[in-house]
Structures are given as structure tokens and as C-alpha cells.
Amino acid sequence: MTSKIFSPKISAVIESLRKLPTIGKKSSQRLALYLLDKSPETAIAIANSLLDATANIKKCVYCQALTEDDVCNICSNTNRDDTKLCIIESMLDMIAIEEAGIYRGKYFVLNGRISPLDGIGPSELKLNILQQIIADRKIDEVILAISPTVEGETTAHFISQMIVKDIKISRIGFGVPFGGELEYLDQQTLLHAFNARTNI
């Protein structure tokens, strides 16, 4: 019914916005109409910034976080603790941990979890790069800050078995419920989770 209301170009904008996480039909319609009718200059600015970013953003050669340079700000920061490596699912987890101010080591961003049903295996998560980093660096602790979902448990187990080097492997714990996503935890809960991490 709504397809008869909107022109093809407006419908195309709505459908594009619907592809974004957490954006449903109504939200995509509201956003599209706002951008096209009330604030076309904002629409142009967003489009230009996205075009510029997609042309220039890449993944850090070490941690796999998004960056404009070959090495991201955290990996190139000599004040960070090189002996600690925190393995996370996404940059949103990195943001949550950094904002909580509870960790000063380095990261490795998986950009997902092992999920055979979705066609995501170790190679998609660049675990070969992670393995090389662990082999090359003087790391004394690997912290698995992975959400306790079924896929997260599978991923954490695979990584812990993959590490043959004699180093401490820990998992954040207290306050993270099964099925919970790390990025949604408040700072106090994250602090408890890091302080109560257990050895694997």
C-alpha cells in the first residue's frame, strides 16, 4: 500500500535506510521524509561523508578496527600495555570498554562470532592474523571479552584452543548474563566483569 504513496526514488531511500540495524519500516519512512523534506542539506552532508569514509576507511593491519591509516590510534599508542590483548566482537565493544576506562592494553576485533549457520568460520574472523599477533608479541594475557551467547561460547572455546603459547587466557565474567551483548552493559557492570575475569 505504501509503495503507491511514495515515488520510486523516495521508496529507494526508505528501503536503503531499512537495511540499517534496528531501523524498521516506520523509522525508515520518518528518516527519509525528514532528510528529503525538512533537511536536504543534512542528507547531502551524510551522503558525502559516507562516500568519503567508504573510499578511505580500512581495517587496522593489527587489530582489525576501522581506521584511515594502516595502524589505528590504539595500536600505534606506545603508552598502551603491549602485554595484554583483549579480544572483542566489534568496535562497539571497544568503545564501551574505552569509555569505562577499565583497560589500557591492546585489542583484536573479531567483527563477528563463529556461526556455521551464517557461514562465518575462523577465516572470516581473521583468526590467522590473531594467531600471528599472539606468536609475534610478548603477550602475557589474552582476555576474551566475548558475549556469552551460543556463538560467543563457541568462538571463545575455539580461540582458547587455538592458542598454544604458554600465556594466561581469561574470560570476563561477573554481571554479563547469558545471551547478553557486551556493548549494552553499563560502565559499572563492565568494571565488575573485567575485575572478576576467570582463567581458562
Curated annotation (Swiss-Prot):
Keywords: DNA damage, DNA recombination, DNA repair, Metal-binding, Zinc, Zinc-finger. It comes from the Bacteria. Pfam families: RecR_C, RecR_HhH, RecR_ZnF, Toprim_4. InterPro entries: DNA_Rcmb_RecR, Rcmb_RecR, Rcmb_RecR_Znf, TOPRIM_dom, TOPRIM_RecR. SUPFAM superfamilies: Recombination protein RecR. A zinc finger (C4-type) spans 60-75. The keyword Ribosomal protein does not apply. The keyword DNA repair applies. Disulfide bonds: none annotated. One of its GO terms (biological process) is DNA recombination. Residues 83-177 form the Toprim domain. GO terms for molecular function: DNA binding; zinc ion binding. May play a role in DNA repair. It seems to be involved in an RecBC-independent recombinational process of DNA repair. It may act with RecF and RecO. PANTHER family: RECOMBINATION PROTEIN RECR (PTHR30446:SF0). NCBIfam families: recR (TIGR00615). Belongs to the RecR family. This is Recombination protein RecR. It comes from Francisella tularensis subsp. mediasiatica (strain FSC147). The gene is recR.
